[in-house]
A protein has these predicted regions:
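Class I SAM-dependent methyltransferase Rossmann-like catalytic core
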Residues: 23-61
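Conserved class I S-adenosyl-L-methionine
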Residues: 64-73
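Conserved SAM-binding loop of SAM-dependent methyltransferases across substrates and taxa
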Residues: 74-86
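Conserved SAM/SAH-binding beta-strand->alpha-helix loop
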Residues: 97-99
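Conserved SAM-binding loop
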Residues: 104-105
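A short glycine-rich, Lys/Arg-flanked "PGG" loop and its adjoining helix->strand segment in the class I
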Residues: 151-163
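Conserved beta-strand signature within the Rossmann-like core of class I S-adenosyl-L-methionine
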Residues: 161-172
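Core SAM-dependent methyltransferase catalytic element
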Residues: 195-228
């Protein structure tokens, strides 16, 4: 019979204790950052694992090129992307908060972390990208920003994507965080997941593509994930 050593973590802590420490440490970091800058942070806790996996599902396993993550925070979506099979060398994390940048660099060796403003994406990533991106995956609190900022971000992201690239965004609301009127200046198609009820609070994932891009068959990976 194989025995499990429950005290093989640093300092003699059990794996369970370490998991709790990491989880609640992330919660504390988010709450602290939210109090310091609630508009930029948007949420008081990191995205849950079901929401993170639902977002990662929209990044094709067959895709190539960089995957840009906006507002990674403590890295739950980053972890889901790595578990999805995205190589660390392809990940570019754009984070505004210095403390989160330091945490991400420690937690995810091999991933590139860029401290900067995601709402000025072209300038922030100038000289960083080495080719068209496969996806831009965003955890930014878009609804905290004026509509022109959201539309400009989508246009900026589309300019970095390859032919099959996608812009993935979650929201706690049930309607698209990118307004329909944006189509007057940025031509796009959008699809939404079913609500991810196991996230607290429940959320929905939106996937945006340039209107000229190939459109996928109707399938909802996020919905399948929630049913598991």
């Amino acid at each position: 019979m194989r025995t499990h050593n429950k005290t093989n973590g640093p300092g003699g802590k059990s794996r369970i204790a370490l998991a709790f420490q990491e989880r609640f440490g992330d919660e504390a970091s988010f709450i602290k950052t939210w109090f310091e800058n609630p508009v930029a942070t948007g949420a008081v806790s990191p995205s849950g694992r079901y929401l993170s996996r639902a977002m990662a599902r929209y990044v094709s396993e067959a895709s190539t090129g960089p995957v840009i993550e906006l507002g990674p925070g403590t890295g739950p979506v980053t972890q889901a992307l790595l578990e999805r099979g995205v190589d660390p060398s392809r990940l570019i994390l754009v984070e505004f908060d210095h403390a989160f940048c330091q945490l991400l660099e420690r937690r995810f060796p091999g991933v590139r972390v860029v401290q900067g403003d995601a709402y000025n994406l072209s300038k922030t990533l100038a000289g960083v990208l080495d080719g068209p991106a496969a996806a831009v995956v965003s955890s930014l609190p878009l609804l905290n920003r004026p509509e022109p900022d959201r539309i400009a971000l989508l246009a900026d992201a589309f300019g970095m994507l390859g032919p099959d690239g996608v812009f993935v965004q979650f929201t706690y609301g049930m309607v698209s965080p990118i307004p329909r009127r944006a189509a007057q200046s940025v031509s796009y198609t959008a699809e939404a997941s079913q609500p991810v009820w196991l996230n607290l609070p429940p959320a929905r994932v939106w996937c945006y593509r340039p209107a000229s891009a190939p459109q996928p068959r109707k399938a909802n990976a996020a919905q399948r994930l929630v049913r598991n």
